[in-house]
Amino acid sequence: LFRHVYTGVKANTKRALDAKDMSKLLSASLPRPLPQSMKESRAWITLMFLLRGMPFVDLAHLRKTDLQDSVISYRRHKTGALLTVEIPPAAMNLIKRYQNTDSASPYLLPILSGNRKSEEEYAEYQHALRKLNYDLKQLAVYCGIKLNVSSYVAKHHTISI
């Protein structure tokens, strides 16, 4: 009766970009200047890639205390596992450029404000993630990339190397 019903999981959605498209996304010079929000989103995806495919949730929740010299030690948001990542010079330059200057905020980067309760913080994170993914789709168009681009490309590209 159910012989022709497919019950498996379809896993053919390609999330990794090829090296050429990833290079365009991260560093290509563009025919017109990017809006500031897209520049920040480009910085976030570049950091995620350079920091071994760090998920956006972990990037957003990095604390100032997680950074020691050229090493970031943090707990993975999803699993609680402690991870230590050596920061390449290009990533350190981006961190210094975009580092959170609000002394009241515990966060390393100005993605989350740090002055909200957990429910509001989650909504703030969700908004930041949606904005990042929207900006990345626009950036892909700017760069002439035909594939769907989201915050997952940093992780999946790093895995595919």
Task: Give the positions of each predicted feature.
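Basic, Lys/Arg- and aromatic-enriched nucleic-acid-binding interface segment
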Residues: 2-56
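Short linear capping/connector segments at secondary-structure termini
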Residues: 2-7, 77, 110-117
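Conserved tyrosine-mediated DNA breakage-rejoining catalytic core shared by Y-recombinases
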Residues: 3-4, 61-97
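Active-site/catalytic core of tyrosine-dependent DNA strand-transfer enzymes
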Residues: 18-23, 88-146
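Active-site lining segments that contact anionic ligands and/or coordinate catalytic metals
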Residues: 20-22, 40-46, 69, 80-82, ...
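Short, contiguous acidic/charged loop-to-helix segments that flank catalytic cores in large enzymes
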Residues: 31-35, 73-86, 119-128, 146-153
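Short, basic (Lys/Arg/His-rich) helix/loop patches that form interaction surfaces
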Residues: 31-36, 133-161
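Short, basic/aromatic-rich helical patch in the C-terminal catalytic core of site-specific tyrosine
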Residues: 45-48, 52, 59, 151-161
